[in-house]
Amino acid sequence: MGRGSEEDRLYHEVAKHMEEIIAPVERDLIKAELTKEAFLRYTNNGNNEVYLVNYHTAPHIMREIGRLRELTFRGAGGGTGLALDIDENDTCEHNYDQLIAWNPEDEEIIAGYRVIRCNNAIDREGNIHLSTSHYFDFSEEFKKQYLPYSIELGRSWVQPRYQPSVDNRKGLFSLDNLWDGLGALVVLNPDIKYLFGKVTMYPRFNAEARDLLIYFMEHYFPDRKKLLKPLDNLFLGYKTDISTFEGIFDGLDYKEGYKILNKRVRELGENIPPLINTYMNLSPTMMTFGTAMNDEFGEVEETGILITIDDIYEVKKDRHIKTFERDKVYGSRTKESTQ
């Protein structure tokens, strides 16, 4: 059997038991919830718009997000297997907000994140209601020194029609649009110092390429303070014999190491996942916290990450953060002004 054929067989076996995804939500219901109050900014590219909504303020948008998330993640080998991907993190009292990029010309939600100020996810008894707490053990230092000043990012997605592999023109700026939204959140929450979350890899990703990528992240973006670690029962180590590339990055700066990583991953028939690529090229001081299995979501693999906002490269700050003042005025971009 060829490479991946057994994984493909298992994937299709699982797919048989998945529910049919719901029909698209009516555009008029979505547009009615894209209010001035929910508007964050216009994007740097594509004349798209970024909004911040939640299940309680925009139930129809939330339903469409649930549909698009399931469509996107299921297509990549993950997903819930349900008719739409909405869980208690979206709907509970300490609910996440939904950061979305909207294409007004196509009338489509093209991409999204769910986000929460971590101090809003702690109840009166001190229990932490964060997605990452299901997979990672938080140190006391992290709880006291980092969590109160962090925004957690999760469930990042770009719907299939707007992925570069499907439509290069439309897909080119999909993730970039979301980062414009994150830039707005950084400005609007000046006490926030960190962006915290996890990046996903799917079980069908080549095992050697996966191990090389994790080895690279541990080498260039280590957690020297031992702030977080995967829960013991969910911890995922290396799957292959890493002695073939151990020491491969020793003595190399990040750019040199990245060239080797990119070349080797491509030789193994894969590409570095776009979101991981974005995070790695955002800040030199990013920290990674090991990899855990998400057994609630198609057994995808989650690697914890933390970015210090002050350390984000200036070129990225200029692009996503400093443009907020220019792009934040609702209605300032009419068709006439953008021609």
Regions found by a protein language model. Give the residues of each.
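Aromatic sugar-binding interfaces of carbohydrate-active proteins
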Residues: 274-281, 286-307
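Conserved N-terminal entry element of GNAT/NAT acetyltransferase domains
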Residues: 13-56
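Catalytic micro-motifs at enzyme active sites that drive phosphoryl/nucleotidyl and oxygen chemistry
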Residues: 83-90, 97-102, 137-143, 184, ...
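Acyl-donor binding region in acyl/amide transferases
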Residues: 70, 80, 120-285
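A short helix-loop-beta-strand connector motif used in the catalytic cores of GNAT acetyltransferases and
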Residues: 90-100, 123, 286-287, 297-303, ...
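Short amphipathic alpha-helix that is part of the acyltransferase structural core
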Residues: 42-87, 97-114
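A contiguous, low-structure linker/loop signature
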Residues: 102-132
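C-terminal non-catalytic accessory extensions
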Residues: 298-339
